[in-house]
């Protein structure tokens, strides 16, 4: 079993490395092609290999855009089989973190919650893989306030790290009633860049395909790289109007890293993307949208 997992992991990493090299060459070709079409100077860093890139452009066509990649392979069963989500917390969780984990369990249809206890991360991931879990969610806290969420897709990754802020739990709102556990419709807004689509896939594939008559709606709305999570149910008051009711919880997500591996491979997995907040242009740039 361990040899098989190691072999599959090596094949996945080799395929990913080849795709990354091919994507880098393709981006260079597109830059040279754009410069020639617009009658502009070829970028300085591409001038040595510009002739070779131009010669290979003759054999390129639009047919390669639909070729599957390691990203497609990670979520190849999305929409075919329902995801199996496991939710746990950091060690020694407070009562409020336990309540937040319980609320997250109700957000994702069919999810299960596991008490962390003294289990190590490696043991958690191995147990999840053995039981067919597709995604492992770990919630972290600071003095009783949830501040971090890790979403690790199994068996090979990726793993996304989010900061949580402005968390409002259902337990904080009196007389809220019960929560619908139907499969929800999803709304994703503002994820127009390549990284944004990647993050959108990581989040939306945590949910199964809904039925047409479901009255439950979950929204992930991106604005200035802060992802607002909202949870509503709706009912039709007449043939034209719809009444929305927020049922909670609500919070904001801020992505700060994506690793190409599972949670226990934190020391060895490659970093696909990392937020650098201390650069001069960090406050001006947005990454999840193309604006």
Curated annotation (Swiss-Prot):
The keyword GTP-binding does not apply. Coiled coil: none annotated. Residues 83-264 form the Brix domain. The keyword Nucleus applies. Keywords: Nucleus, Ribonucleoprotein, Ribosome biogenesis, rRNA processing. Pfam families: Brix (PF04427). Its main location: nucleus. GO terms for biological process: ribosomal small subunit biogenesis; rRNA processing. One of its GO terms (cellular component) is preribosome. Gene3D superfamilies: Probable brix-domain ribosomal biogenesis protein (3.40.50.10480). Component of the 60-80S U3 small nucleolar ribonucleoprotein (U3 snoRNP). Required for the early cleavages during pre-18S ribosomal RNA processing. Part of the small subunit (SSU) processome, first precursor of the small eukaryotic ribosomal subunit. During the assembly of the SSU processome in the nucleolus, many ribosome biogenesis factors, an RNA chaperone and ribosomal proteins associate with the nascent pre-rRNA and work in concert to generate RNA folding, modifications, rearrangements and cleavage as well as targeted degradation of pre-ribosomal RNA by the RNA exosome. Part of the small subunit (SSU) processome, composed of more than 70 proteins and the RNA chaperone small nucleolar RNA (snoRNA) U3. Component of a heterotrimeric complex containing IMP3, IMP4 and MPHOSPH10. Interacts with MPHOSPH10. This is U3 small nucleolar ribonucleoprotein protein IMP4. It comes from Rattus norvegicus (Rat). The lineage of its organism: Eukaryota, Metazoa, Chordata, Craniata, Vertebrata. The gene is Imp4.
């Amino acid at each position: 079993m361990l040899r098989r997992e190691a072999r599959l992991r090596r094949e996945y990493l080799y395929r990913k490395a080849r795709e990354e090299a091919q994507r880098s060459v393709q981006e260079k070709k597109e830059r040279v092609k754009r410069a020639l079409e617009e009658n502009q100077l070829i970028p300085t860093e591409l001038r040595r290999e510009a002739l070779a890139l131009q010669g290979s452009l003759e054999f390129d066509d639009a047919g390669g855009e639909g070729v599957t990649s390691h990203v497609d392979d990670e979520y190849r069963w999305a929409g075919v089989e329902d995801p199996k989500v496991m939710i746990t917390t950091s060690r020694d969780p407070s009562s409020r973190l336990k309540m937040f984990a319980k609320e997250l369990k109700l957000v994702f249809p069919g999810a299960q919650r596991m008490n962390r206890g003294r289990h190590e991360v490696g043991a958690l991931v191995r147990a999840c893989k053995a039981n067919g879990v597709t995604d492992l969610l770990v919630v972290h806290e600071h003095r009783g306030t949830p501040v971090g969420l890790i979403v690790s897709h199994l068996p090979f990754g990726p793993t996304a790290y989010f900061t949580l802020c402005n968390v409002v739990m259902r337990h904080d709102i009196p007389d809220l009633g019960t929560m619908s556990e139907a499969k929800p419709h999803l709304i994703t807004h503002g994820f127009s860049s390549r990284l944004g689509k990647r993050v959108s896939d990581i989040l939306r594939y945590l949910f199964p395909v809904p039925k047409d008559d479901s009255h439950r709606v979950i929204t992930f709305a991106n604005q200035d790289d802060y992802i607002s999570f909202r949870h509503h149910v709706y009912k039709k008051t007449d043939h034209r109007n719809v009444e929305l009711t927020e049922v909670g919880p609500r919070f904001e997500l801020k992505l700060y890293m994506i690793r190409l591996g599972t949670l226990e491979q934190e020391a060895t997995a490659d970093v696909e993307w990392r937020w650098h907040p201390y650069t001069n242009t960090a406050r001006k740039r947005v990454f999840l949208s193309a604006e």
